[in-house]
Amino acid sequence: LVGGAAIEGFRDRLYAHAVQGSPPKPDFPFPLRYEGVYRERRKVCGVQLYQALGISREDRASAAQQSLENFRFFGAPHVALITTEDELGVYGAVDCGLYVSNFMLAAQNLGVASIAQAALASYPDFIRDHFGLPPNRKFVCGISFGYADPAHPINSYRTARATEGESTTWIE
């Protein structure tokens, strides 16, 4: 967990690293493309996000700037950096997913807002170097958290959720 003075230095350095155009090199590859329902959900989420922020579809510069806000943790005062041991392979990442879900549910129960951020996984070498982590610690994602600003436009919408029928197969 990073907060206080430590997060400010980290935020500034990570943002500068991203702004300079460093190519992403995640420990776990990002999807090459999204197809079908995943593509549609991603598109709808993006449209809602940019509409809430007043960014038009044609305004690529503002959209790019908003994307870079990932590397400033969207202004959150804290970030949890989620890593796993290389030796655990994909199952270590699965365990991390379970941890992230529980972390976020616990935070919500305490009135703390959070956002899981895969974008932070773009620069694992930078993060390992910044915090002196060994190379066998593989970076999965970050969770930025703090108290939400209800007046911020980003908090004015919620993404849709898949129905039970879309996400669950019952076998009897």
Model-assigned labels for residue ranges:
Residues 1-172:
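Acidic, surface-exposed loops and disordered segments
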